[in-house]
Amino acid sequence: MSEETEDIWGIAHVHASFNNTIITITDQTGAETLAKSSGGTVVKQNRDEASPYAAMQMAEVVAEKALDRGVEGVDVRVRGPGGNLQTSPGPGAQATIRALARAGLEIGRIEDVTPTPHDGTRAPKNSGF
């Protein structure tokens, strides 16, 4: 009896704001964290935490940890600041997805999970959004 091993897939949660980028890879249920990294772990200056370069470095680190745990592919969930803030993700989001694919992880579906208010609180004064 030869049993085929099932491909293990995870979810890559990418929170990309204009100040920082955070990448977390969990199992399919989202209950167990397999790997995580943020901008401050790969660059020295605070201003570089949200840069595409930092996002690529984080994605390489996270992908290596995930591949060591047997994850073969990920579904990507990109999130911007949301709420009354910007609904577009920061500059690190696109670089993260590219770097995850380059690092050897198979990319399934990519979805935007930025929270949108259904007429929530009043926006801050002088907000250009």
From Swiss-Prot:
Molecular function (Gene Ontology), one example? structural constituent of ribosome
**A Pfam family assignment:** Ribosomal_S11
Q: Report the SUPFAM superfamilies cross-referenced here.
A: Translational machinery components
- Domain of life, per UniProt, equals Archaea
| Biological process, per Gene Ontology | translation
What InterPro entries would the database entry show? Ribosomal_uS11, Ribosomal_uS11_archaeal, Ribosomal_uS11_CS, Ribosomal_uS11_sf
- Keyword Ribosomal protein applies: yes
Q: Name one GO cellular component term.
A: ribosome
What does the sequence similarity comment in the record state about its family? Answer: Belongs to the universal ribosomal protein uS11 family.
Role, per record? Located on the platform of the 30S subunit.
**Protein name stated in the entry:** Small ribosomal subunit protein uS11
